[in-house]
């Protein structure tokens, strides 16, 4: 079962997690593979990262829309990584060769730390929606309507649900669980229900994919007070 850590607010959470990422990266004697989501949840963490301490960092993006958008499109994960993470090196899965992403990760020694977020309405993690198999690997998936609605908030430039892509390429739950450590972030009142659902579980439940954190020996759930169910 994942350990719970509670912070005063999203900024404190982000600073603390960023310091842990930087320290782990500095200790690494090889490229440090950091699994990274796009979207709102990790923004305070990325903002607090110190570029001077991250020369070995490789940002391993967990997903991308299909068809792959222009790297300048507002919904492009490549654009998000460039503007928000700023790692020296960034990897993205290729929908034409999803298995190659798994091989690349394995050949580089595996993901050292996977940062995670949970969908507010359906607990999706990366683009793994309700019912995703625990054994799933990088693949192209059709996005659930709940995931697409959540992405209207993640990418507010979408004018309507009709503009949100219907497919994406995503790492699988087994890809995530293979990482050496997992840190799942929930902050703000709009994530309180998701936090309550996740904290009510003590093992993986395929109806709430983010619960993969409960099936890992080094996993933490980081919430701020606004997201904590008791607040």
State the predicted function of each range.
Residues 1-34:
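N-terminal glycine-/serine-/threonine-rich phosphate-binding loop
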Residues 26-52:
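Glycine-rich N-terminal segment of FAD-binding domains in flavoprotein oxidoreductases
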Residues 27, 52-53, 105-109, 168, ...:
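Solvent-exposed alpha-helices and their adjacent loops that cap or buttress functional pockets
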Residues 36-41, 118-119, 187:
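Glycine-rich beta-strand-to-loop/alpha-helix junction loops that act as flexible
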Residues 47-54, 79, 130-139, 201:
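A glycine- and small-aliphatic-rich helix-loop capping segment at beta-alpha/alpha-beta transitions
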Residues 54-117:
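Ligand-binding beta-strand-loop-alpha-helix segment within the catalytic cores
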Residues 124-171:
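Class I SAM-dependent methyltransferase SAM-binding "motif I" and its flanking Rossmann-like core
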Residues 171-174, 178-231:
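ATP/nucleoside-binding phosphotransfer catalytic cores, i.e., glycine-rich phosphate-binding loops
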